[in-house]
């Protein structure tokens, strides 16, 4: 059986080590001999038996030591080296199976400190402690390296190297989700942030708990980017819990502008009672009060289910507590109250009677509900023309599309359009308005408006305000059907400053009726910011 080249190399190294140490050994031996009054011979230092043993290790009797075999060993070593040099580059961090180091010389394949640290992520190699992460029955055992965690988090530093440092080999963390904890560790080991929608809140909790502000900020930015009406109420609740004022402010922007969508979302029914009270108290909710009342009832039903209570009017009142009396029921129209709250059974007979009397009687009874209507949000208007004009032979509607593209430098909510009407007296128009982004329709509405013959603009609204992101071009269109002669805008501007928002305009290929940047229809964009 031929000798393994690896074994041969090992024995050569032993011999080489011996000869490197030989001069020092000779010096020590001579000094010892002088001290004893005699000089030792070299054969006493290197006995013949030892020489034979070393020779046997280098060239065992079972091995063929002819030149051909030596050349074969050299060739094998050369081939192994070539294979090593031709090895593929190390895989990306997220593909690493970190409990299977690829070779005994793995350090040479990872030239940077970050790569080498990243290879240790979730790796048993050199791990000096384990975390048991997650609740009992759903926990995960995670290997970690104290030093890496300690240099990335003051909490971990205190845990491992502080005055009250943990000495256990396993540390239990039942309040953190395993997936979120691994995202935290991946950042500490490699600076990589790999966030996902279904774990970002749990990751934010972990980042806050272990004081890793860069990861916490990344989580907040991720949440702000994904924020929309259907999750705004839940994120508001979480932002208050995590004390993230910027995220809280963004949540309020969405909830105020898209209040009806937010209150009708499933997420609204998942919030805590305190957040419910804060939302219902909000002065700037941009919706009708019967929508608020219906949302509160839906929340009460969901809360009864969470508490294991039967869904009855009494239990709904009990779980709501004072929140019921934050709804501004008297600000509904009489019709809205009669068709909604009065038939809900959650109000007592006395409360229902008193509210009806408040609507109709000269001597109004005192009510426990707020009487003042919410202010809502005041819409803002971006006017893109400096003047308007009318020429009988120039601007007509024939069911063609008027369209313009726009972009903004901060997030806003487009609520509708301001349009020119007839230049020949009072007239009614049917109109279809549309908002698109990169060809995808975000909102549209088919409605009517009446113009009075003046050059004023007339508002046409989308069903719900639409969130518009910054630095992206959107297309608004209007197709009018009615009196053919109309006012039109002149001296159009490519850039308009409107409050804190800057609008940019450019022509749209969808426009087939002559509207462009310099003139035409769609003089105003109506928005909330």
Curated annotation (Swiss-Prot):
Q: Which residue positions does the secretion signal occupy?
A: none
Chain ranges of the BTB domain: 127-197
Pfam annotation, one family: PHR
Task: Enumerate the InterPro entries for this protein.
Answer: BACK, BTB/POZ_dom, BTB_POZ_BTBD6, PHR, PHR_sf, SKP1/BTB/POZ_sf
Q: Where in the cell is it found?
A: Cytoplasm
PROSITE patterns reported in the protein's UniProt record: BTB
Alphabetic keyword roster: Cytoplasm
Look up the record and report any one GO term of the cellular component aspect: cytoplasm
Question: What is the role of the protein in this entry?
Answer: Adapter protein for the cul3 E3 ubiquitin-protein ligase complex. Involved in late neuronal development and muscle formation.
Question: Could you describe the subunit structure of this protein?
Answer: Homodimer and heterodimer. Interacts with cul3 via the BTB domain.
Q: What is this protein called?
A: BTB/POZ domain-containing protein 6
Q: Which organism is it from?
A: Xenopus tropicalis
